[in-house]
């Protein structure tokens, strides 16, 4: 298991399950419908996806969250330091599952699967990042997985706001 970064680490776990896969789990105090909206509505996604400690902003967020749809996310402080991430949605089941490709690395890109399971008004989220090879997994490093702790804490804040409405 990789180390936890957030103050509520008992709620987020990051585990390397094979030499090609990492799985993150977290329980959110919100219904699956709201968690899905936060993952699928660009105006909400922009508010939580980039960890604050990185000091960057999500400059552009284009998402067509449906099976066969595409996404493109552009990060950076200014146009000279922009990084683009893009891919396709392989499967989307509202309030239950989103599967997408990460194509910025070409053939070495991963496939991300997010599943949502609601129980008693809370949602268990399981996010799997599967790489095509061990070498691709190793090249990706653990930075993104470690940043997930802060990102999910930010998602918690957004979900609390949405739940209060």
Where are the language model's segments positioned?
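Hydrophobic pocket/interface hotspot
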Residues: 35, 45, 71-73, 89, ...
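Intrinsic-disorder/low-complexity, polar/charged segments enriched in Ser/Thr/Lys/Arg/Asp/Glu/Gln
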Residues: 19-25, 58, 70, 84, ...
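A conserved amphipathic terminal alpha-helix motif
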Residues: 1-8, 130-165
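Beta-strand/loop substructures that line and gate deep hydrophobic ligand-binding cavities in soluble
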Residues: 21, 99-150
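Hydrophobic ligand-binding cavity/cleft-lining segments
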Residues: 1-55
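A short, structured loop/turn motif at beta-sheet edges
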Residues: 32-33, 65-66, 90-96, 115-124
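Short beta-edge strand/loop motif at the mouth of beta-sheet-based domains
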Residues: 23-24, 43-82, 165
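Hydrophobic/aromatic beta-strand elements that line small-molecule binding cavities or substrate pockets
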Residues: 26, 60-63, 85-91, 102, ...
